[in-house]
Amino acid sequence: MAFTVYDCHEDIRNILVTPQIRARFCRLEPGSGSLDFGHTHDLGHEIFIILEGRVEFQISGNVNELGPGQMCYALVDEPHSVRVIGEEPVLMYLSVTPHIQPTHTFYDDDRNRRPPHFRPSSDYNTETDSTTPMDEIIDRHVDTARELYECARENLATQEAQAALLKRALTDDDLETANAIRETMWLPQLELFKQMHTTADVWNTLAPRAGSVNAHY
């Protein structure tokens, strides 16, 4: 099956946007950006890879210069900002995982958290579902939350039932039994994580229509 190849010179946009990840190419012009306190992500780790040009990144108060072929990252709750240095435009890849609204947390001049900053889906180069009635989306959101709860209950029951068996197998150095128990423990966790992604997907559909939104920064 064919797949799409993307080019950092032509596809300057969000390319992949799912609850698991948001990935994009960016172009930053000379003189743009600043090393202010910046913003944070409540849930997401963000990775930056410089493809062309040079920048300075500020992450949690520390500043470093990056050039082509270099990367850095900002973890959850780490304030970060960037500015271009030199006369050359910057091409950069970035990804944030996971991608769940509200994606950015901003701060006032005293570094106090501002209210949640929900954004329209168009900010991420995706379309908001504007045709499905909101009552239906809200009901779907509640249904997926309930399914997540049931998955969590089933997962907990399995982990509790298998924990002592796994301890015994490892104590006895019985790796064959331990391998089988580990697989038994993994399967309900797999379903739990899948349901978490489904729940996040419905939430990302609900959030832009559930109140006011603020475009861009």
Listing of model-derived features with the role each one plays in the protein:
Residues 57-58, 74, 80-86:
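Short beta-strand His + acidic residue motifs that chelate non-heme Fe in jelly-roll/DSBH
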Residues 130-185, 189:
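Long, charged, low-complexity terminal extensions
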Residues 168-217:
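C-terminal non-catalytic accessory extensions
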Residues 85-149:
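Double-stranded beta-helix
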Residues 43, 62, 78-79, 88:
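A generic "binding-loop/recognition-motif" signal
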Residues 18, 60-77:
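Short acidic-glycine-tyrosine-enriched beta hairpin
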Residues 43-55, 69:
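Glycine- and acidic-residue-biased ligand/ion/polar-headgroup-sensing regions
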Residues 2-38, 44, 95-104:
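A short glycine-rich, His/Asp/Glu-containing loop-to-beta-strand
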